[in-house]
């Protein structure tokens, strides 16, 4: 029987025999009675097994992480911390872990645990993080399914750079960079975004989304950057920026509400161990009406803050500034005191595909800023005018021949389209309170780090 089932059905199992296979978390010997803490991975909560010290020599030898089979009875323990326990009749040591098993009961640093990423999910902290990650991924699929979105698998290998930043990993079978003789007959790279392909499918299905790995060869050794991460990228035809904003708000609230309902114990653990006040922060997001501020208004607010004596690391605030985390957090934490959408950014600091506004200075872009981290989501309405799109590609030196298929979507009946990108790891960091992206992805890929 799974330990999860015992917790769910314990009242109906009283004094009944159960058989459990589990992993030893701790094994404490007493004079007459000994205590073994077990978990089999099916539940966050550990199960206490009580056995007589005399006559259970095999059980006494079981080290941390060893596998045991327990046959015993479920008994109530109202006077103790746990509601019930299993009193063992038989304990069989199935497989003994080595004495110097790397994860002993003592506290380990996150830096050390990153070096043993293949084992760290067995700790309570990473068990909670990865349970929440799994639940959040399911919630995303469920949200879009309920809204009748079509899930598409955008390609991992591509010849397009959707961001135009040139920070892509090359995919090649050659050492001489002669791409015409390469596998695809041209230069290929790992995808930095599935958005362009999602736009094409949105013209067929109206509402689509991608959810898959993306790659950036950006040599950034920060707590927020990884070379491989997952992105959620919805795209909706016939939608404008206002529709996009509503979809972002609905999705973020849905995911957080799902975690509150289905992973409350893990959330409480993260609140205790990773970020004090985490639950209050998340409650603020899921219960708030998100605010909307234009980029121009945000610049004026920041200018006034500098005049009033507020210290920013970047205090030269002018139109055209690419807002930093300190500016984003000031807007949503100090001014609006709520999650905030900032809209209509200068076109020079945004991607080529964003719809140009009538002022010819800004584009119909939106970023969602949340208390604690700043930007969580970035999106836009897409440029629907073919001539404007071609002109913008040329202005930012994007090869229009490479993107002919994408640009030509505007020639086949194209009336509005909008979408956004949400970095999944950044979302998991926000929900769990983890402070480093390396701690929310099972096997992190960062500069000079390819351990597994």
From Swiss-Prot:
GO terms for biological process: asparaginyl-tRNA aminoacylation. Its EC number is 6.1.1.22. The keyword Hydrolase does not apply. PROSITE patterns: AA_TRNA_LIGASE_II. It comes from the Bacteria. Homodimer. Keywords: Aminoacyl-tRNA synthetase, ATP-binding, Cytoplasm, Ligase, Nucleotide-binding, Protein biosynthesis. Gene3D superfamilies: Bira Bifunctional Protein, Domain 2, Nucleic acid-binding proteins. It is an enzyme of class 6 (ligase). Its main location: cytoplasm. It is found in: Cytoplasm. This is Asparagine--tRNA ligase. PANTHER family: ASPARAGINE--TRNA LIGASE, MITOCHONDRIAL-RELATED, ASPARTYL/LYSYL-TRNA SYNTHETASE. One of its GO terms (molecular function) is ATP binding. It catalyses: tRNA(Asn) + L-asparagine + ATP = L-asparaginyl-tRNA(Asn) + AMP + diphosphate + H(+). It comes from Mycoplasma mycoides subsp. mycoides SC (strain CCUG 32753 / NCTC 10114 / PG1).
């Amino acid at each position: 029987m799974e330990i999860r089932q015992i917790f769910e059905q314990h009242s109906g199992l009283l004094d009944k025999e159960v058989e459990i296979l589990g992993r030893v978390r701790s094994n404490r010997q007493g004079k007459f009675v000994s205590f073994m803490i077990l978990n089999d991975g099916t539940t966050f909560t550990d199960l206490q097994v009580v056995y007589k010290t005399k006559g259970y020599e095999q059980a006494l030898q079981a080290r941390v992480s060893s596998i045991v089979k327990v046959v015993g009875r479920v008994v109530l323990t109202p006077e103790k911390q746990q509601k019930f326990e299993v009193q063992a009749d038989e304990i069989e040591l199935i497989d003994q872990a080595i004495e110097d098993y790397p994860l002993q009961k003592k506290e380990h640093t996150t830096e050390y645990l990153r070096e043993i990423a293949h084992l760290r999910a067995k700790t309570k902290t990473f068990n909670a993080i990865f349970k929440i990650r799994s639940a959040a991924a399911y919630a995303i699929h469920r949200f879009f399914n309920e809204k009748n979105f079509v899930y598409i698998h955008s390609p991992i290998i591509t010849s397009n750079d959707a961001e135009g930043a040139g920070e892509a990993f090359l995919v090649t079978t050659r050492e001489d960079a002669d791409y015409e003789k390469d596998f695809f007959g041209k230069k290929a790279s790992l995808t930095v975004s599935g958005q362009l392909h999602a736009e094409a499918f949105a013209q067929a299905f109206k509402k689509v989304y991608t959810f898959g790995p993306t790659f950036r060869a950006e040599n950034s050794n920060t707590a927020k950057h990884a070379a491989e991460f997952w992105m959620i990228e919805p795209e909706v035809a016939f939608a404008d920026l206002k529709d996009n904003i509503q979809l972002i708000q609905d999705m973020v609230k849905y995911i957080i509400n799902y975690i509150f309902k289905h992973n409350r114990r893990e959330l409480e653990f993260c609140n205790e161990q990773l970020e004090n006040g985490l639950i209050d922060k998340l409650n603020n997001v899921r219960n708030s009406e998100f605010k909307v501020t234009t980029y121009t208004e945000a610049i004026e607010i920041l200018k006034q803050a500098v005049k009033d004596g507020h210290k920013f690391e970047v205090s030269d605030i002018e139109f055209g500034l690419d807002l930093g985390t300190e500016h984003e957090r000031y807007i949503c934490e100090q001014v609006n005191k709520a999650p905030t959408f900032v809209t209509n950014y200068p076109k020079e600091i945004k991607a080529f595909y964003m719809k140009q506004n009538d002022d010819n200075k800004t584009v119909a872009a939106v970023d969602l800023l949340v208390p604690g981290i700043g930007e969580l989501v970035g999106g836009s309405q897409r440029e629907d005018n073919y001539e404007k799109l071609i002109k913008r590609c040329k202005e930012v030196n994007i090869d229009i021949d490479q993107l002919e298929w994408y640009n030509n979507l505007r020639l086949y009946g194209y009336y509005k389209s909008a979408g956004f990108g949400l970095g999944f790891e950044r979302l998991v960091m926000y929900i769990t309170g983890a402070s480093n992206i390396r701690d929310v992805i099972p096997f992190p890929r960062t500069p000079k780090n390819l351990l597994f």
